[in-house]
Swiss-Prot record:
Function of the molecule: Cell wall formation.
Gene name in the database record: murB
Cellular component terms per the entry's GO annotation: cytosol
InterPro entries cross-referenced by the UniProt entry: FAD-bd_PCMH (IPR016166), FAD-bd_PCMH-like_sf (IPR036318), FAD-bd_PCMH_sub1 (IPR016167), FAD-bd_PCMH_sub2 (IPR016169), MurB (IPR003170), MurB_C (IPR011601), MurB_C_sf (IPR036635), Oxid_FAD_bind_N (IPR006094)
Keyword vocabulary terms for this entry: Cell cycle, Cell division, Cell shape, Cell wall biogenesis/degradation, Cytoplasm, FAD, Flavoprotein, NADP, Oxidoreductase, Peptidoglycan synthesis
A Pfam family reported for this protein in Swiss-Prot or TrEMBL: MurB_C
UniProt subcellular location: Cytoplasm
GO molecular function term, any single one: UDP-N-acetylmuramate dehydrogenase activity
Protein name per UniProt: UDP-N-acetylenolpyruvoylglucosamine reductase
Length: 324
């Protein structure tokens, strides 16, 4: 049963859409966007051609229409009922650029894959970016969640962030404005990040290459990189590793429907067949419940979950726990 109506929403935008150069798709299947390959429809998806096109669209959008922004879908779970309102998915052509900007500085578009900035830095003898080689996803998501791996994180490298607000106004945020913490930014949720300026340090290419090779080898050895996964499912609680807590409750390899906690790395949830978003979220909340009952620790999702549940299929937090 469809919970959204994209054609009706498109009609509300009026004739101004004829001036747009990007792509408008009513009832867009989100399972084609997310790495989990599961989930419902976006009521209306817009892929802007460039920044000006994005601004034009935002000025057409009625204030009461919900707005969601997605990147490459690497750490995203869209519920089976879909996402009401507009989903903006930035295009690689308009928002995927990479360029040097001053000594040891790189500007990256929001949809630029994380590993591309690592490669460009290496090619130009700029150190400090090798950790990005082990992070799936794009720069926009890294800026939003302070993505990190292998001892590095986004907050260490970012200088400023370009963003557009709901009304189409451009903003430039400093690192302090971003309010970074562990896998978190306190920047306003309504801002659409369009690029970031990063700074590294001079380093020999051979040393950078060795570091990137180590990152790649580690990731391929301990993570299910060839599976349909969204990356790390839960954040590491202070003083603990999420995977160890999951392992202690027997969560490694646990399956619900077509969803499984990976046997290779049990903080990675994978779609092993035709899992629904319900299967995946139910599994995650079951794990949270088991960990809480044993240790009293409430694992926090690192995977972003969006959209509506199907009627009668709502997933409750901490499944199986009678009281918190």
């Amino acid at each position: 049963m469809k919970q959204v109506d994209g054609e009706k929403l498109l009609a509300r935008l009026g004739p101004g859409v004829d001036a747009l150069r990007g792509r408008l798709t009513p009832d867009a299947p989100m399972d084609r966007v997310t790495w989990f390959q599961a989930g419902g429809l976006a009521e209306l998806m817009f892929q802007p051609h460039d920044r000006d096109d994005l601004v034009t669209f935002l000025k057409l959008l009625p204030d009461d229409v919900p707005l969601t922004v997605v990147g490459v879908g690497s750490n995203l779970l869209v519920r089976d009922g879909g996402i009401p309102g507009v989903v903006i998915r930035l295009s690689a052509k308009g928002f995927g650029g990479l360029e040097l900007e001053g000594e040891n500085r790189i500007r990256a578009g929001a949809i630029c894959p994380d590993k591309h900035i690592a490669a460009m830095a290496m090619d130009n003898n700029i150190g400090g970016f090798a950790f990005y080689y082990g992070i799936p996803g794009s720069i926009g998501g890294a800026l939003r969640m302070n993505a990190g791996a292998n001892g590095g994180e986004t907050a260490e490298r970012v200088i400023e962030v370009e963003a557009v607000d709901r009304q189409g106004n451009l903003h430039v945020l400093s690192k302090a404005d971003m309010g970074y913490g562990y896998r978190h930014s306190s920047a306003p949720e309504g801002l659409i990040f369009i690029s970031g300026l990063f700074e590294g340090f001079s380093q020999e290419k051979s040393a950078i290459r060795a570091e990137m090779d180590a990152v790649r080898q580690h990731r391929e050895t301990v993570q299910p990189v060839k599976e349909k996964t969204g990356g790390s499912t839960f954040k590491n609680p202070e003083g603990h590793s999420a995977w160890e807590l999951i392992d202690e409750v027997g969560g490694r390899g646990l399956m619900i429907g077509g969803a499984q906690m990976s046997s290779l790395h049990c903080n990675f949830m994978i779609n092993v067949g035709h899992a629904t978003a319900y299967d995946l979220e139910y599994l995650g909340e079951t794990i949270r419940g088991q960990v809480f009952e044993q240790s009293g620790i409430k694992l926090q999702w690192e995977i972003k979950r969006l959209g509506l549940f199907m009627p009668g299929s709502e997933v409750k937090p901490f499944m199986g726990v009678t009281s918190e």
